[in-house]
C-alpha cells in the first residue's frame, strides 16, 4: 500500500503519521503539521518544524543536515486548484508554471493540508542580517512544487524562502 493510499488530506486536524517503524508496522504517533510525526520528519527528510527565528512568523522549517545548492529541501504539497480564489489559501498558494495547454490544475494551495513541510518555510524579507537561502520551484507539467536550496545551507539553519514579487504585491 502506498503512502498516498494510507493518508487522507485534512484541514489542520490531527492525523496519524504515514511512516512505518523498523518492524514494518505503521507509526502510531499523531501529527497536525505534516503527514510525518516529528521523529519521522527528521529521520526521513532531515527537517524540523519549530519556532521561527523571524519575529512574529510563527513556526519555521529547519534543516538538520547541510543542504547543497540547487537541491530540493522539501516538497510543497497541497490541494491542486484551477484558480486562486479568495476561498483558497491566499498566503499558501503557489502558481505552477507552464504553458496554457498544461494540465488544468494551475496552483497548489497548502493552507488546508497537513502533508508537506514546505509550507512552514518563511521569507527573510525586511529582516536585518537574514537572507533567503531557498526559493520555490514549480512546474505544471509534472504537477509539483518544491522548496529548493539557492545556496549551501548549514545544518541547523532555518529554511528561508523567497516568496516572489506576486506575494509581496498583495502584502505591501
Q: What are the roles of these predicted feature ranges?
A:
Residues 1-9, 35-38, 45:
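Fe(II)/2-oxoglutarate
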Residues 2-12, 125-172:
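C-terminal SET catalytic tail plus cysteine-rich post-SET Zn-binding segment of SAM-dependent SET-domain
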Residues 15-43:
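Cys/His-rich Zn2+-coordinating "finger/knuckle" modules used by eukaryotic regulatory proteins
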Residues 26-29, 38-39, 49, 75-76, ...:
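Intrinsically disordered, low-complexity regions enriched in proline, serine, glycine
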Residues 44-130:
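Catalytic cores of histone-lysine modification enzymes
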